[in-house]
Amino acid sequence: MITIFHQLPHLEAYGNPQYFFYLILAVLPVFIGLFFKRRFPIYEALVSLAFIILMLTGKDLNQIISLLAYVVWQVVLVFAYQLYRKKYDNNWVFYISVFLAILPLAWTKVTPLMTIDNHQSLFGFLGISYLTFRAVGTIMEVRDGVLKEFSLWQFLRFMLFMPTFSSGPIDRFNRFNEDYENIPERDELLDMLEESVHYLMLGFLYKFILAYIFGTLLLIPLKEMALQMGGIFNIATLGVMYTYGLDLFFDFAGYSMFALAISNLMGIKSPVNFNQPFKSRDLKEFWNRWHMSLSFWFRDFVFMRLVKVLVKHKVFKNRNVTSSVAYIINMLIMGFWHGLTWYYIAYGLFHGVGLVINDAWVRKKKKINRDRKKQGLSPLPDNKWTQGLGIFITFNVVMLSFLLFSGFLDQLWFPKPPVK
């Protein structure tokens, strides 16, 4: 059996045309079945499992073994908490359950810091972050009473949904299960098919053409030039800032479109991840358009709960201070989620402080307009020019944050001595 796994080819998720050929061929019977109001649960499970295994195969079987252990761990936690929640509701039991659900991911983040040569954890695997969001979200919704009864099969189907397995979008159990249980009508399925073709074409443009131009043809030489010029900041670093930011968007948005396309073919309308984020007029709007499934998850499961706790215990008298502290903690946690390096943490702090400043400006603007109204004056201008200025400022602030996120400043400011 182990020999068979070693002989399997490795297929990078949405990595090349060969992958798409195999994948579309595999999910085509699922879509045809939906057209005749039928699902093939066992076949769908086998397709998902097969492609997940092919994503995780490689030099060794560590990722496959880790995934198996991880799924068993989360199943035990989720169903133990579901059983407990039917009769009891203790805060500490809930906190411990969430902590234990996050523990495998935290371990994979911490392990490289504990080794001399930054070796990755043996317990990590592709997609562990996104599976953790699903598991933790499920526990929280069980606590809230939103989820009460669900089977092992339903939970595994949700956790191991292949199109969004490796990098999202992040879904919620109820939304996913409702899609699965309610097969769309033929007209809607045809619309979903048309949408899938659109997503695939746009995804190919984004990921394989535009991301290649920005991420390979432009970014690599600009990085080399910036490192040669040195210093705190230089003109080539400015080029790195914009090319990296655009590469990040086109690469990730392209991947997300592929995930949405294949989800549609399997009868699931997964959440949209990007909605023209560079049209945002301020930072709050940006987070309502950028990596939306992640930002909405943090909003619902971290920010709102943190605000509720702070208000309940009257930690701060001023509600604006409460929301400001919650913004910073929320975005810091997001930074830590990306990785335990100074630039990821600084990225989270950057956006937390940015959202605080954004809210402060909105409040200030409202006050100015109220005062102007009392004086019989017109409000501050809000037209295409001011909106355009807001878009310009937001775009550049976001690009600066992406430069921080990229880790390139770590190379520029703290160059490592050459290996002898």
For each feature predicted by the language model, list its residue ranges:
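Membrane-embedded transmembrane alpha-helical bundles that form the catalytic cores
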Residues: I2-K420
